[in-house]
Amino acid sequence: MAGQFVQYGRHRKRRNYARISEVLELPNLIEIQTKSYDWFLEEGLLEMFRDISPIEDFTGNLSLEFVDYRLGEPKYDLEESKNRDTTYSAPLRVKVRLIIKETGEVKEQEVFMGDFPLMTDTGTFVINGAERVIVSQLVRSPSVYFNEKLDKNGRTNFDATIIPNRGAWLEYETDAKDVVYVRIDRTRKLPLTVLLRALGFSTDQEIVDLLGDNEYLRNTLEKDGTETTDQALLEIYERLRPGEPPTVENAKSLLYSRFFDPKRYDLASVGRYKANKKLHLKHRLFNQKLAEPIVNTETGEIVAEEGTVLDRRNLDEIMDVLEANANSEVFELEGTVIDEPVEIQSIKVYVPNDEEGRTTTVIGNAFPDSEVKCITPADIIASMSYFFNLLSGIGFTDDIDHLGNRRLRSVGELLQNQFRIGLSRMERVVRERMSIQDTDSVTPQQLINIRPVIASIKEFFGSSQLSQFMDQANPLAELTHKRRLSALGPGGLTRERAQMEVRDVHYSHYGRMCPIETPEGPNIGLINSLSSYARVNEFGFIETPYRKVDLETNSITDQIDYLTADEEDSYVVAQANSTLDENGRFIADEVVCRFRGNNTVMAKEKMDYMDVSPKQVVSAATACIPFLENDDSNRALMGANMQRQAVPLMNPESPFVGTGMEHVAARDSGAAIVAKRKGRVEHVESNEILVRQLIEEDGQEYEGELDRYPLAKFKRSNTGTCYNQRPIVASGDVVTKGEILADGPSMELGEMALGRNVVVGFMTWDGYNYEDAVIMSERLVKDDVYTSIHIEEYESEARDTKLGPEEITRDIPNVSDSALKNLDDRGIVYVGAEVNDGDILVGKVTPKGVTELTAEERLLHAIFGEKAREVRDTSLRVPHGAGGIVLDVKVFNREEGDDTLSPGVNQLVRVYIVQKRKIHVGDKMCGRHGNKGVISKLVPEEDMPYLPDGTPIDIMLNPLGVPSRMNIGQVLELHLGMAAKNLGIHVASPVFDGASDEDVWSTIEEAGMARDGKTVLYDGRTGEPFDNRISVGVMYMLKLAHMVDDKLHARSTGPYSLVTQQPLGGKAQFGGQRFGEMEVWALEAYGAAYTLQEILTYKSDDTVGRVKTYESIVKGENITKPGVPESFRVLMKELQSLGLDVKIMDEHDNEIDMQDNEEEDVVERKVDLQQKDAPQSQKEVTD
């Protein structure tokens, strides 16, 4: 027997065909969200308050400091926040200290800084009652980048950019005349030496001594028109502030504020780390030949002779000496932009492949520590040196698509940036208030205006591109949404500008970003998913784990190192499937491995690391596809994406052929109820589980407190599907921390269960499965195999209007008793009522405008009392095409103290309607391998082809759907699924390490099936066997969210566009079918004149004709001739607006009056075609 049984959770055993043992548990899959938010609360906020403190007034007398902060208790818990449509948040209180320096007085006060949204345990936020997810953003890391490109003559030109986290960019570039230029903040370019002079290197000789003599520098000095530091400063000022009178002082302060002011310029710790790494001498001197000896300044000993070629070993020795300040120079740049001395380290080396033996100077930035978040003059000099070195052939250009140069901004950092914007706006207000307020009586509370802070947080959660309505179609969709990485958003790329290179799969994605899962369409490659084992480090770079190889024994150790993409470039990594002996040594002498994006074979002694698992390459959703290795990548992409669209079924079932990921994905998705700590289940109900905590101390077990786990019952998810949780533990069970207590939607026994296992045959049947169509047995309808539950929410508000308040009531004008049969005495539908489209859910009347009364009418009113005020019916009705059973009704009243209602609303009624949708012709189905299709026919069970034992099959798929698509995984799944069903087991075939062909065939034989997996099928209609044996097996098939009930639509009469008077478009507007230009040509070609005439007039924009037609149909008369279409009048007006005097003549050359009197005629008849449920907006009008 191939494979061994593995336990997944409490209830499920699977036969696992993996050959590689798991050395590392999968991490918590939503850690990227929770960890980042925790960092924000613990460190990020504090960092922000530290950055902004102290705020001082313009005289320096008042100083405001933020000392500490705390989060209070949320006003409403999670469930209550969802019910009340409020944000799940806690009050943020900040301790503020105000110091009055004149008197030395200190005032401390705790200030309320607004309600701060809290993250739920499952990594989401509840904003205005809706669950939202903050997607992590992939951006270019702040750093120094060097780039090369060919000009039109085929010459290589270099350019460099220093990109900060925030602040001005600094760019270097060369031109055709070999002059090096600098651009400050995207302005016009200046010779590079102008910036050096401005920094304090005033003479040409100083500059040449600093950077080393070369032709590029000489050309640049010739081009440079300045000769002193002051001239250079004025030149820069004129470029940055054209039109303003330049002075040296202004120029100094401008240059200082652009680059050296911590409030204006921020490299961030990641930028400092990357810049130090790039400008560090060690990487730049590798394989270079020294042009001067290196001497240890303390001992006078020569560490490396002139002419030494530096390799890794002697570089390490030299670095130790350099760190002890050898070869370092200090320049005193007093009286310039920065008064501090500048320390650099420089070493002369020979230019590679140069016959004349020229030298160049390599300058490093003398390691500023990680606290220096600004750029320093040493950084600028070192980056210029790197640029000149590149021109001499020393150094490397950067690949901007490499994940070493792209980093993630997760929730915490995005929030921090948003909070910083709010605080800096607040800072301005505080400064202004400081100058106005009386210093004796001022308190911190009076100075602080929290509005900008609250507004910026609200704006971020409510309308940022990265704050998204959670995709809650099923647990996998939730999980994937939380692990999504987007290159779009503020500060990122735009769809239109993103080139092919950015979207493409890069070798550095290995183990960090999934190469499969990305949307099809304009966002392809810009939105990605985190790989299964990946994690994010403190700098925001994605790391992936590797097993360390002991270089002395060449054996794999238990040590696991997480490497970023640029760290990995220094090592040789072996594949996870390399065979090892019992001591952990490689068996083969030559091992398949990766080095810097090349897949190659190297000697086993050269290995540094080994992959931890074959599935570390792919994301959680892709890892749920069995036999992924046998599918074409394009189809695997569709398979991974379509799993997210699977509708939760009424009776879910986990797959016979899984991958072992189903349990982990279900546990971490947030849809299941997971035990917070070890305990014993005391009580289980459908809506609550009670667990008594068990504490172990000194070998004894004690009972602790009681944990309550409420379960969600038949709630509406964000996507309108049914969100229901079912307990899977019993009283008395002892549960461990992290164990699943209750299944969520699309789960069965603690595993993801997106679809059902059905018996599938690959065969044609009367052409009904042409073009990927699916033929299905009626048994699947009858037995509710693919039945799903859908819940829609409708709401109606009673507001205060100018003419008086709206009223929710059963007393509605001009409505028959039968229309009110489902309403209670309040005028609200009762729970359990069955409603169809057009039925009233909430009766509501709105006051009409009262006309001015005559004196006689007023007298009569005074005598006989108030006449009933005129009201119109604005009841909430079931929209077109909806309907079902009323599941729940929620009523919120202002009088009863519901303070969450929006202004002007007195009462809010929410009605939930549930539908049970069976599978239909027209519904979309799919497997897990990108094999999708639409149901074309439901065949009676007795007509379906049947197996030799008489069992009818469930689904017929077209065999032509397999070869051209190259997703062979579905065929292997089919065979293994049938074997698993016959053996009564579940199996796991992990990605890239699953069941081999031999495993599949041996399992088939074990199940007593034919070795080729085919069987004789009999036609259910005739009882005859089909000519050939057919592949029949069990495939896991999903019902997708694209259901025909949501798409089918037909219009009778309805709303019309205000301008063109033509029917609106789309199902939501109850619109018509567009009959466009080409369709008109088709009818013209057929000569169908009358059909064409009625389409262009009555059915479209002949406003008079359509009313008369309706009237004629009602009265049973002949239909009158059509009038003039409104679009013709619009054309006339357009021509008149161009100054053309257009007249319309009849065949006798008499002018036709376009101001038709028929319209007034229609108004007099008052034919009211108003559709009660037609949506009314400014764009629409209803006849």
Curated annotation (Swiss-Prot):
InterPro entries attached here?
A: DNA-dir_RNA_pol_bsu_external_1, DNA-dir_RNA_pol_su2, DNA-dir_RNAP_su2_dom, DNA-dir_RNAP_su2_hyb_sf, RNA_pol_bsu_bac, RNA_pol_bsu_CS, RNA_pol_bsu_protrusion, RNA_pol_Rpb2_2
Tell me the NCBIfam families matching this sequence: PRK00405.1, rpoB
Ranges of compositional bias, category Polar residues? 1173-1183
Organism this protein belongs to? Staphylococcus saprophyticus subsp. saprophyticus (strain ATCC 15305 / DSM 20229 / NCIMB 8711 / NCTC 7292 / S-41)
What does the organism's lineage look like at the top? Bacteria, Bacillati, Bacillota, Bacilli, Bacillales
The protein in question is named DNA-directed RNA polymerase subunit beta
Determine if Transferase is one of this entry's keywords.
Answer: yes
Show the GO MF annotations: DNA binding; DNA-directed RNA polymerase activity; ribonucleoside binding
Q: Which Pfam families match?
A: RNA_pol_Rpb2_1, RNA_pol_Rpb2_2, RNA_pol_Rpb2_3, RNA_pol_Rpb2_45, RNA_pol_Rpb2_6, RNA_pol_Rpb2_7
Is the keyword Nucleus in the record? Answer: no
HAMAP family linked to this entry: RNApol_bact_RpoB
What is the protein's known function?
A: DNA-dependent RNA polymerase catalyzes the transcription of DNA into RNA using the four ribonucleoside triphosphates as substrates.
